[in-house]
Amino acid sequence: MSKVLILKSSILGGYSQSAVLIDHLASHWETQGAAITVRDLGGKDVLPMVDGEIASGLRGGAELSARQQEMLALSDTLVAELKANDTIVIAAPMYNFTIPAQLKNWIDFIARAGVTFTYTETGPKGLVEGKRAVLVTTRGGAHKDGPTDHVVPYLKTVLGFIGITNVEVVYAEALNMGPEAHDKGMSEAKHSIDQLKA
C-alpha cells in the first residue's frame, strides 16, 4: 500500500483551484488503496513563520529557549512525516510568479543540514531518497516552461537538494483567462491526474 503525504498550500479556501485538483487526486488514489495524509499549510495546519530565533533553534544545541525547543520538535515531526511517506504531493498555486509563503515556510522547516541533506567533499547530498513527488500547480496565466515560471524549477531544485529527484508535474494553466480557458485548464489537469498511479 502506497503512503502519500499531500501538502495543500492555498490561502483561498473554497475558491482554491489547486484544492479542487488535490481533492480529485486524493479521491482517485484512495480507490487504488493509497493511505493518504493531508497537511493544509494554508488552513488548519498553518505553520509559524520561520524567523531568526526559530532558524537558529533548528540547528539544535544545548541552550535552546522554550520556543526554540517547541519549533525544533515541530520540525522533527514534519521531517518524520516526510520520510514516512512514499509519495509527496505538493499543491503549488502560483502567487505573483512563485509559491505561497506557507509552502516556502514548510520548506524552511524541513530543509535542515544533517537531517534532510548534508554537505560532502564533492558537494551537497540529499538524505530523503527513494521518494516520488507530484507537483500540482495552478496559475491564472500561461507560464509553463517560460521565464515567468518560478514555481516548478524552484520546487524541483529544493526537492532534488534533499534527495527527491523523481518528480512529476500536473499543470493547470490560464485559469483566469476566461471561462473557456479555465474549464480547459482544469479539464486537462484532471485528465493528467487520472493517468497517475498512486
UniProtKB/Swiss-Prot annotation:
It comes from Shewanella baltica (strain OS195). Keywords: Flavoprotein, FMN, NAD, Oxidoreductase. Signal peptide: none annotated. InterPro entries: Flavodoxin_fold (IPR003680), Flavoprotein-like_sf (IPR029039), FMN-dep_NADH:Q_OxRdtase_AzoR1 (IPR050104), NADH:quinone_OxRdtase_FMN_depd (IPR023048). SUPFAM superfamilies: Flavoproteins. Its EC number is 1.6.5.-, 1.7.1.17. Homodimer. Pfam families: Flavodoxin_2. This is FMN-dependent NADH:quinone oxidoreductase. Transmembrane segments: none annotated. Binds 1 FMN per subunit. Its cofactor is FMN. FMN binds at residues 10, 16-18, 94-97, 138-141. The gene is azoR.
